[in-house]
């Protein structure tokens, strides 16, 4: 198409077009642009949000929540007279122990308290405490002037015993445990059924089993099942390693066992898991030197707490060991450990399931034959199969690949199962189980 204007005139028109000044938007235009894309009730919602922010600001100013840079409230909000009165009314209390209650059934009972390393006093109750709150042998808080009882105190528990309580639930569930289907069912019958359906045992007139012994070769899933139980139940879970109860001084281990069960009785329902119980539960014998006397005292205290004169209450006890033949017969008898669950080596189906569990969190090929891998790992424990999966990932990392192939798993089987066979202690433990 011919250009009738000419190249020079067209260039001049384009320059005039570019030289037009850019007009800035005024406030009205900006407000109009902000309304684009808003819903019908946007203005009302914005107004309500502004009102809420203003109210929160006023509340914070009145309550003094917003503090200054020094970490203190503004001086205008200080109330020194009230603070002084509070300090005078709430004096620090002294810890004592109520040893005896005189005339407990009368309207004006008296309490004999023993202040440690000081003296004994016969005192009254303050107005804040009811007579039913105080029992003989209980620790109480008394004031320093009249020695009146102000508050009942919880029993004294060693901090090392308190730290054995598991606060956070483990992330292991029953679906993460492979090759232990029968063992998990037996464990749930003892632990979960009495807590969730106690009426079944009441109707039959029997007491549920209160103690379980988990035994088997290393790496078969004993501790893993206990972690799954802790995740499943809402009861308090306390984990104790047997060697923690072996103390330096005489009587310390027995005292820790006593305080452990005392703390467990304060809970609504409690599970105590003793791992490696053969550290303190070995059969008693006299070696002539008396080196194991303290360990035997600890075990005797444990035996007494499991089934002694005092009732155990709603406390379930789980114990795990690799050597059940070394445990004391008094610890193994029914009433203390009612059920013995053996964790044997997983079969072909169990090994295949364990491979799938560990491969679930890995980047692997889709067509890996896990049953073939399980057949190549006879008499292997779950821990060894987990090591195979880890080594397969290491082979993939060495080859700079993002996924693990079946070849990596086969090489890992040759390395872990075949090469490390001389380090395996499973056959040795199988002779004892």
Curated annotation (Swiss-Prot):
Pfam families to which the protein is assigned, alphabetical: AAA, AAA_lid_3, PRS7_OB
The answer on whether this UniProt entry bears the keyword DNA damage reads no
Domain of life, source organism: Eukaryota
Residues of the region (Disordered) are: 1-21
For this UniProt record, the keywords arranged alphabetically read as follows: Acetylation, ATP-binding, Cytoplasm, Nucleotide-binding, Phosphoprotein, Proteasome, Ubl conjugation
Q: How is it modified after translation?
A: Monoubiquitinated by RNF181.
Cysteine disulfide partners in this protein: none
- Provide one Gene Ontology biological process annotation: ubiquitin-dependent protein catabolic process
Positions of ATP binding: 216-223
Q: Which residues carry this modification: N6-acetyllysine?
A: 116, 422
What are the GO MF terms of this UniProt record?
Answer: ATP binding; ATP hydrolysis activity; proteasome-activating activity
Q: What Gene3D superfamilies does the entry give?
A: 1.10.8.60, Nucleic acid-binding proteins, P-loop containing nucleotide triphosphate hydrolases
The record ties this protein, via SUPFAM superfamilies, to: P-loop containing nucleoside triphosphate hydrolases
Feature: compositional bias, Basic and acidic residues: 8-21
InterPro entries registered for this protein in UniProt:
26S_Proteasome_ATPase, AAA+_ATPase, AAA_lid_3, ATPase_AAA_core, ATPase_AAA_CS, NA-bd_OB-fold, P-loop_NTPase, PRS7-like_OB
Q: Can you say where in the cell this protein is located?
A: Cytoplasm
Q: Can you supply one Gene Ontology CC term for this chain's record?
A: cytosol
Does the UniProt entry include the keyword Acetylation? yes
Coiled-coil boundaries:
none
Task of the protein: Component of the 26S proteasome, a multiprotein complex involved in the ATP-dependent degradation of ubiquitinated proteins. This complex plays a key role in the maintenance of protein homeostasis by removing misfolded or damaged proteins, which could impair cellular functions, and by removing proteins whose functions are no longer required. Therefore, the proteasome participates in numerous cellular processes, including cell cycle progression, apoptosis, or DNA damage repair.
Q: Which family is this protein grouped under?
A: Belongs to the AAA ATPase family.
> Quaternary arrangement and interactors, per the entry?
Component of the 19S proteasome regulatory particle complex. The 26S proteasome consists of a 20S core particle (CP) and two 19S regulatory subunits (RP). The regulatory particle is made of a lid composed of 9 subunits, a base containing 6 ATPases including PSMC2 and few additional components. Interacts with NDC80 and SQSTM1. Interacts with PAAF1. Interacts with TRIM5.
Q: What is this protein identified as?
A: 26S proteasome regulatory subunit 7
The organism encoding this protein is Mus musculus (Mouse)
Lineage, highest ranks first: Eukaryota, Metazoa, Chordata, Craniata, Vertebrata
């Amino acid at each position: 198409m011919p250009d009738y204007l000419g190249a020079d005139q067209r260039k001049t028109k384009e320059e005039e077009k570019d030289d037009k000044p850019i007009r800035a938007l005024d406030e009205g235009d900006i407000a109009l642009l902000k309304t684009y894309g808003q819903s019908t009730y946007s203005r009302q919602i914005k107004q309500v949000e502004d009102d809420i922010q203003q109210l929160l600001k006023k509340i914070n100013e009145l309550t003094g929540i917003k503090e200054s840079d020094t970490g203190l409230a503004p001086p205008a909000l200080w109330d020194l007279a009230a603070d002084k009165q509070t300090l005078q009314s709430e004096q620090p209390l002294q810890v004592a122990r109520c040893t005896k209650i005189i005339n407990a059934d009368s309207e004006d009972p008296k309490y004999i308290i023993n202040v440690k390393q000081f003296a004994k006093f016969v005192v009254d109750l303050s107005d804040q405490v009811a007579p039913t709150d105080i029992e003989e042998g209980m620790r109480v808080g008394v004031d320093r002037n009249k020695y009146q009882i102000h508050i009942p105190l919880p029993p004294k528990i060693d901090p090392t015993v308190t730290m054995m309580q598991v606060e956070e639930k483990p992330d292991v569930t029953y679906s993460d445990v492979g090759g232990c289907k029968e063992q998990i069912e037996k464990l749930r019958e003892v632990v979960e059924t009495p807590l969730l359906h106690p009426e079944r045992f009441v109707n039959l007139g029997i007491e549920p089993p209160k103690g379980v012994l988990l035994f088997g070769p290393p790496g078969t899933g004993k501790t893993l099942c206990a972690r799954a139980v802790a995740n499943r139940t809402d009861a308090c879970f306390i984990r104790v390693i047997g060697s923690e109860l072996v103390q330096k001084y005489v009587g310390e281990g027995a005292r820790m066992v006593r305080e452990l069960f005392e703390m467990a009785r304060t809970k609504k329902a409690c599970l105590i898991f003793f791992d490696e119980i053969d550290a303190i539960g070995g059969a008693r014998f006299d070696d002539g030197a008396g080196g194991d006397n303290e360990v035997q005292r600890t075990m005797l205290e444990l035996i007494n707490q499991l089934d002694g004169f005092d009732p155990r209450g709603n406390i379930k006890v789980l114990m795990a060991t690799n050597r059940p033949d070394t445990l004391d017969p008094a610890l193994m008898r029914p009433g203390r450990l009612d059920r013995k669950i053996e964790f044997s080596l997983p079969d072909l189906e169990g090994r295949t399931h364990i491979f799938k569990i560990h491969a679930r969190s890995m980047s692997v090929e889709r067509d890996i034959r896990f049953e073939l891998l399980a057949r190549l790992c006879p008499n292997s424990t779950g821990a060894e199969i987990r090591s195979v999966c880890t080594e397969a990932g290491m082979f993939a990392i060495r080859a700079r690949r993002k996924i693990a192939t079946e070849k990596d798993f086969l090489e890992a089987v040759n390395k872990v199962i075949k090469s490390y066979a001389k380090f395996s202690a499973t056959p040795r433990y199988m002779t004892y189980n």
